[in-house]
Amino acid sequence: MTISRAVYAGAVVLASVVALGAWNPLGQANAREGKSGQVPRFVVDPLWPKPIPARWVTGEVAGTCIDSRDHIFTVNRRNADALETSFGWPLAPPVVEYDGEGNVVNAWGNPAVVPTGLHGCFVDYQDNVWIAGNGDGIVQKYSHDGTLLLQIGTKGHCDSPTGACGVPDSNSSPIYLNEPADVSVDPANGDVYVADGYGNHRVAVFDKNGRFLRQWGSAGTAPGQFAPGGGGHPHCVVFDNRGLLYVCDRANDRIQVFDKFGNLKEVIPVKPGTGSVPGPYGNPDGSGRNAVGSANDLDFSIDRDQQYMFVNDVGNSSLWVFDRLLGNRILGGFGRPGHQAGEFTLFHSVAVDSKGNMYTGETVGGRRSQKFVPRGFISTEHLETFRGSPHYDPLPGKGAERRDD
């Protein structure tokens, strides 16, 4: 099993129909071996997770990751809305651990210590839990039960001339980060790869002790660059089982594939131009469009070849399935905007366990986790023609703790 925030995936179909489980399940025997012209599909489990203790309020679920026991970790921003505050419901701890049945088995984290603006989450090959924060300058490594083991960067001090967080494009410090979005660990040697993508636009690499090794990337649209602006570019870093690093370049609507030293191997488009909608930030071209983008997070199927890549498209409230054996062709997808089971609002993270169950997290407006169970395959000839989503949820104003994704 490959440990990252997820591990396998199986995936997808007719937008809402299959995601909501209206189709009769296909044979489970085929769920691990895809064939040309077939798309893996999921059915939503509307009863996952089970009610959490003491009416905890998780707020926005920014990151989702899975350990070697198929326990699901979520990182929660704990931002109660007005109704929740009026009832006096307690805030959940920043990190909550669930078993596969949806029971809370542990929870931990000191709100004063964890990164501001909790964001990405990763479980490494030793079952340590890593978290990043896009309102801060740190990435942290915790033991499985929540003991802080390592911190890269300085809390409240970012890579900028004044140390302020969110000042764009410094891209220079070997010791400071600038609102990192995500983190991944190389199981071969323990090196740490950081998507330093909200203030900076780089992948920064550290050894297992936190010593800076190298970096690559800058703001732009050329191959090897990451989209300008403050929306998390790069937004995810995920290793495949060949040791290649897949990096989400969200507002450029693409996944960029690098070797461990930053040599670009491939650029994979993800529905270009469809995930950008009117909003407060605007694109660098001055169009007044929201740079939310379509390449937010990803994971792979658990078969030996990792045939399928699953990409979380926040701008279109969809999950796309790519066939890597067919030149990273998009086979299909599921999801639509909404708040019912199987729908997404600010679809932010995706993770898959060793059984092929997919777990998702939603931030602004969504504020929840969902579970999708694999149910065989469907022929691509039954898939709907894609239409870009006109829906978006307004992103919040600028602030120290970014909530946009």
PLM segments and residue spans:
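Eukaryotic scaffold repeat domains enriched in small/polar residues
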Residues: S4-G10, A19-D405
